[in-house]
Amino acid sequence: MRWPCSSRFRGLWPEAAPWAVLLALGVPGWVLAVSATVAAVVPEQHVSSAGQAPLDWLLTDRGPFHRAQEYADFMERYRQGFTTRYRIYREFARWKVNNLALERKDFFSLPLPLAPEFVRNIRLLGRRPNLQQVTENLIKKYGTHFLLSATLGGEESLTIFVDKRKLSRKSETLGGVPVVGGTGNSSAVSLETLHQLAASYFIDRESTLRRLHHIQIATGAIKVTETRTGPLGCSNYDNLDSVSSVLVQSPENKVQLLGLQVLLPEHLRERFVAAALSYITCSSEGELVCRENDCWCKCSPTFPECNCPDADIQAMEDSLLQIQDSWATHNRQFEESEEFQTLLKRLPSDRFLNSTAISQYWTMDANLQHRYQQLGASLKVLLKKMHRIVRRLFNLCKRCHRQPRFRLPKERSLSFWWNRIQSLLYCGESTFPGTFLEQSHSCTCPYDQSSCQGPIPCALGEGPACAHCASDNTTRCGSCNPGYVLAQGLCRPEVAESLENFLGLETDLQDLELKYLLQKRDSRIEVHSIFISNDMRLGSWFDPSWRKRMLLTLKSNKYKPGLVHVMLALSLQICLTKNSTLEPVMAIYVNPFGGSHSESWFMPVNEGSFPDWERTNVDAAAQCQNWTITLGNRWKTFFETVHVYLRSRIKSLDDSSNETIYYEPLEMTDPSKNLGYMKINTLQVFGYSLPFDPDAIRDLILQLDYPYTQGSQDSALLQLIELRDRVNQLSPPGKVRLDLFSCLLRHRLKLANNEVGRIQSSLRAFNSKLPNPVEYETGKLCS
């Protein structure tokens, strides 16, 4: 006799088997129950119908549930398309079966009437049997449990299998057409109708079945099955609704089993429990071991893979492969959907669409957004199911020699779909479209396709992108943005023309060459200038104490206004009388392009990285030295006038620290107390002169107000910006560059202040429109 799976077990550990085998107890003259053995379960393979979700997680060998008739009926209906089941049932019980042998032992304290063969097998085990002996002599012959009590009864049920797709189509077709039953009542064919009919089955059975059969014939969307079961002659159902009926749902009316170890001697009980658990859990292929909340089978040498259920693992791996196929199918259906194809047709073809432009069209399409959300919901369900299977798969493979083989699909991001649209637009000239690469504006074609790239329109945008595509050929630019010029269908940065006609700024004089020429005092790098001073004359001795500060001026351009000069070095030859304690101190002011003395900048000698004076002896007898400060190519600057303020200080030796100290001399009224005399032989500026055409620059400025074409105005602005930057680049060192360009306009072109301001504003406005504009702050030098 086989008992239902809802039976209750007592006596074994919680890891006991989900079903049990009943023990035969012999009583003199009669048999209480017959023994049963475990039947080998044959796995049933099911294949789900096309277009429906697989049920492989149910199809492996998991016990008697898969051999039940109810499960077989469900799978059969599922293959036919009925995805939903409604079932209403009631159970009844009338006969209670108890183990009389146990009652006899409990009430009368009599020994159990065990079968002689069972007792003989116990004695054959001895005092310390191994698990294999217990399994062979007891478990395989008598099972693991025996019957304690049970309730016998039956069941009456009504099962309705529903195909929701057919039901919804029939409802839309019929609309409000009534479904007439035997009683004349009418209602729409819907799930609510089925709910009401199922609920009224036990109240009015005949009428309910008649109406359900009518719906089944009319729609074909449901299958109705009526089941009545009951053991031991329970074929009379007339009084099922009477008060004497007992429902099996009550807790006391379940099958109760007791572990067989309670019948064994004390020394065999623990070994029997271990053998029973190993037999049930490990299928006699190993020994069950439990440690630290984890149990596994210690495999015997004959079955080294007893912990590795290959059939279950293979079934789960197959399920993961099917989910991957479903994942790819969902993505393909989204790409082939009406919403996606509609977006492709709406995209403009007269210009190139980058990812940002496609994302804007994507965001504005509400229907596509809704369809994309549906795709995400479907993939989320698949991913959740896949994670669940993967967790179970890793648990099963925890003690396997091989690791599971699977690949988790990744959800495609929005950027993937935007690139997919680009690929369909620009790489679809073959059977299978290639992959578009936005960085290189090219296509990567499939290996079996020689070419898949179609015409790619020009890209519109700022900077080097096109302002408009050509009307006759959309792959080429028709016009460009400010700061760029059209060349062979492409926009290239517009470069200012050469400034040689206005101001020659190029030189190839290197620092080593300059240093060599300065040592030789080469006249080829000397800038001719006029020496002016009211305090002294060149080549004459003078008393430095006569004035506290003397002004020496070198002025160029007095007779050559068509040149501007660049200073690379400044040199003075200073002579002192013998035993003189005076030391010359010079402050240098440079005026770049003329104007008042206040429009000069101070030279920061020996401050930061700025060079210091270099002194070389010329005449030891007269104590003459060349004082030279070399600016080089790094610190070179424009000059028109150089002002040298000469002071003197007294050099002395500190006896305490053995260091040289300087202090200012006092004004001497007595000539006999003179501290020495000084003589300046030469004052020279070394550098080079640049050709300068003020009239050409004025003509260039006139094009800002009276352009011949827009291109000529842009070209003039570019040249003026280039000239401004090149001039200001020779600004003296400091935190902020000085605005030498305004000084050039003000003093060499003789422009008014408001005219200079207007030109600077025009240059700043045009420069802001150029690609990668470079703006820098400048300090005011000229008023």
From Swiss-Prot:
Protein name according to UniProt: BMP/retinoic acid-inducible neural-specific protein 2
Name any one Pfam family assigned in the record. Answer: EGF_BRNP1-3
Question: Keywords for this entry?
Answer: Cell cycle, Glycoprotein, Growth arrest, Secreted, Signal
Q: Which residues form the signal peptide?
A: 1-33
What is this protein's gene name? Brinp2
Glycan attachment residues as annotated in the record = N185, N354, N473, N579, N626, N658
Recorded GO cellular component terms are: cytoplasm; dendrite; extracellular region; neuronal cell body
Organism listed in the record: Rattus norvegicus (Rat)
Instruction: Report the family membership.
Output: Belongs to the BRINP family.
Chief place where the protein resides? secreted
Q: What does this protein do?
A: Inhibits neuronal cell proliferation by negative regulation of the cell cycle transition.
> Per the UniProt entry, what are the Gene Ontology biological process annotations, in alphabetical order?
cellular response to retinoic acid; central nervous system neuron differentiation; locomotion; multicellular organism growth; negative regulation of cell cycle; negative regulation of mitotic cell cycle; nervous system development; positive regulation of neuron differentiation
Q: Does the keyword Signal apply?
A: yes
| Summary of the tissues where the protein is detected | Expressed in olfactory bulb, cerebellum and neuronal layers in hippocampus.
Give the subcellular location: Secreted
